[in-house]
């Protein structure tokens, strides 16, 4: 397969052809938690609270899978750009193997710590019980998630975005169909409640992996997974973790943030914990759409970086940034105009609806500013500059927002937590802008 179109095709058509399937994929993929939440909300408010408390753990699993997958994706694309197919094959093989090991370890550790983790945020035994029921099943599918996302990043690295889109859509459709059947016991299906939501998600994710395997066997791609390369090589492992660890931390930081904010909000009322949980369900539509553009950008940028096309790398960044700003602008308008309508998808509690609308009004003020941070972090990952990418995310999710939320909650009240979001986005955007001109901008000029 000829990969030279990555550096020859006009940037906008190339970016859209790579990114649009990923935008659709990420939009559909975000439905996993959204659909679970919509149906779980019909069980009880306690069930919705349990789901909100388990969300950081789900996000952590996904973060490790995707973060290390970013390393797989970037290294493969760089080797393909440099014409080193054998090294690309080694990266794919050893990257997949390592991510499967990650999944096994996560399952074991997760099952051990979940009771203590949930007890940190609530004394309600009903909520803890539901959280354990849901998280136990979710954790059992960790290895499948790791393998599935590894294949996703391998297919993306060779530019095969359509298969990724179809695989993710298949898993989501299976999840949507099974959710009501397993939660409420429709027909001959057992009534499993919140456990049914977790099982439906796991089966959906398994369907995605099965489709990847079928396509890989029947329609071979440019990169091969070979048993001869299963023996880990220090150089290959170092390359993968050099990008994968910062990328994983980038994606895991939101889990840490949600847990920290849950602790602050729980001191006021469980209502605010639910509001935060619903907000993160809603914002996945917005940020995963933007992330779809970035996933389309990443292999193109990595390939051109490997091919020494530095001026083209800079143009790819700017084009992606303009599109993401547009996405964030639309999200800002929607959240400002119809916040209660959005919240009502997940709850009919009047207090939750009112407080949720206030939260969305305040938080959406930082959406457009976040474009700088989001695109810059993705670009740095594509160029193998994991430390810079991690610095942006660390500022955005820890250094600014958590202290600001704590201080403002004490001085302004609970609404101060929501103001901490846009404050963090603006400060981080300024720093990301400076890093861009120091590194990517300078590289493009040279």
Regions found by a protein language model. Give the residues of each.
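Short alpha-helical transmembrane segments in multi-pass integral membrane proteins
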Residues: 1-19, 76-143, 189-245, 301-366, ...
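Residue-level signal for short hydrophobic patches within transmembrane helices
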Residues: 8, 12-31, 35, 57-64, ...
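Transmembrane helical elements of multi-pass membrane transporters/channels
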Residues: 17-36, 137, 171, 204-208, ...
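Helix-terminus/linker motif at the lipid-water interface of multi-pass membrane proteins
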Residues: 27, 31-49, 118-125, 181-192, ...
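Small-residue-rich hydrophobic transmembrane alpha-helices
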Residues: 48-108, 145-164, 262, 275-339, ...
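Hydrophobic transmembrane alpha-helices of multi-pass small-molecule transporters
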Residues: 60-63, 107, 175-180, 209-213, ...
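Short runs within selected transmembrane alpha-helices of multi-pass transporters and secretion channels
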Residues: 69, 138-156, 164-172, 197-210, ...
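Structural signal for membrane-spanning alpha-helices in multi-pass inner-membrane proteins
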Residues: 110, 153, 179, 183, ...
């Amino acid at each position: 397969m000829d990969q030279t179109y990555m550096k020859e095709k006009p940037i906008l058509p190339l970016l859209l052809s790579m990114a649009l399937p990923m935008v659709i994929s990420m939009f559909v993929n975000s439905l996993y938690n959204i659909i679970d939440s919509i149906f779980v909300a019909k069980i009880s408010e306690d069930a919705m609270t349990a789901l909100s408390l388990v969300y950081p753990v789900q996000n952590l699993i996904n973060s490790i899978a995707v973060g290390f997958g970013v390393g797989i994706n970037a290294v493969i694309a760089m080797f393909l750009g440099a014409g080193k197919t054998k090294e690309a094959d080694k990266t794919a093989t050893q990257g997949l193997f390592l991510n499967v090991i990650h999944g096994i370890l996560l399952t074991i550790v997760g099952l051990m710590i979940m009771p203590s983790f949930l007890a940190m945020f609530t004394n309600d035994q009903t909520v803890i019980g539901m959280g354990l029921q849901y998280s136990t099943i979710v954790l059992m599918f960790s290895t499948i998630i790791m393998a599935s996302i590894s294949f996703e990043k391998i297919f993306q690295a060779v530019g095969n975005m359509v298969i990724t889109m179809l695989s993710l859509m298949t898993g989501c459709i299976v999840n949507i169909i099974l959710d009501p059947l397993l939660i409420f016991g429709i027909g001959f299906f057992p009534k499993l409640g919140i456990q049914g939501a977790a099982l439906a998600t796991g089966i959906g994710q398994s369907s995605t992996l099965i489709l990847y395997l079928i396509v890989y066997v029947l329609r071979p791609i440019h990169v091969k997974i070979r048993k001869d390369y299963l023996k880990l090589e220090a150089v290959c492992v170092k390359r993968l973790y050099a990008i994968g660890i910062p990328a994983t931390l980038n994606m895991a930081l939101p889990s840490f943030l949600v847990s920290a904010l849950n602790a602050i909000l729980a001191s006021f009322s469980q209502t605010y914990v639910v509001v935060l949980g619903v907000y993160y369900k809603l914002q996945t539509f917005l940020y995963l759409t933007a992330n779809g553009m970035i996933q389309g950008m990443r292999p193109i940028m990595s390939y051109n970086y490997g091919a020494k096309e530095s001026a083209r790398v800079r143009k790819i960044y700017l084009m992606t940034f303009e599109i993401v700003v547009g996405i964030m602008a639309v999200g800002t308008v929607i959240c400002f105009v119809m916040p209660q309508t959005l919240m009502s998808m997940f709850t009919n509690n009047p207090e939750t609806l009112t407080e949720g609308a206030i939260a969305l009004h305040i938080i959406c003020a930082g959406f457009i500013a976040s474009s700088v941070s989001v695109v810059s972090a993705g670009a740095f990952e594509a160029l193998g500059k994991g430390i810079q990418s991690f610095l942006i995310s660390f500022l955005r999710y820890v250094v600014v927002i958590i202290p600001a939320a704590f201080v403002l909650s004490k001085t302004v009240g609970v609404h101060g937590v929501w103001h901490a979001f846009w404050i963090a986005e603006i400060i981080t955007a300024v720093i990301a802008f400076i890093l861009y001109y120091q590194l990517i901008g300078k590289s493009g000029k040279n």
